[in-house]
């Protein structure tokens, strides 16, 4: 019997004056994705964080934001092990003048058989 999964906490915290830095880092990660390079855990978390910030500023609800999580990244966008590390992600967000929101993603990157599937032979 293996050990149970251990959760970890990653804190993204920035003030308004850090907004430009946040957006520059997000653009660097998006550039990496556009070159078909795979993201590590920290980069994947940043993508989800940026998505949430954008969705909150568009006045979307917590459930609308959470329901779109499976469309953000796929197993082909991330390194092996990232989907397992991010089986459940909870963001506690206080942004601008919006009330605090709690966004929870459950298995945002599907893990079912992703190591066993060869995208070249599957046509993906």
Task: Give, region by region, the residue ranges found by the protein language model.
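Non-transmembrane, aqueous-exposed alpha-helical and coiled segments at domain scale
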Residues: 1-123
């Amino acid at each position: 019997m293996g050990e149970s999964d251990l959760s970890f906490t990653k804190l993204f915290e920035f003030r308004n004056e850090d907004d430009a830095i946040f957006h520059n880092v997000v653009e660097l990660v998006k550039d990496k994705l556009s070159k078909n390079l795979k993201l590590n855990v920290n980069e994947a978390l940043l993508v989800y964080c940026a998505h949430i910030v954008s969705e909150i500023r568009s006045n979307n609800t917590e459930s609308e934001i959470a329901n779109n999580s499976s469309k953000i990244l796929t197993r082909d966008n991330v390194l092996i092990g990232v989907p397992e590390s991010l089986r459940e992600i909870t963001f506690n967000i206080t942004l601008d003048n919006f009330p605090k929101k709690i966004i929870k993603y459950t298995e945002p990157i599907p893990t079912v058989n992703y190591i066993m599937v060869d995208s070249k032979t599957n046509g993906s």
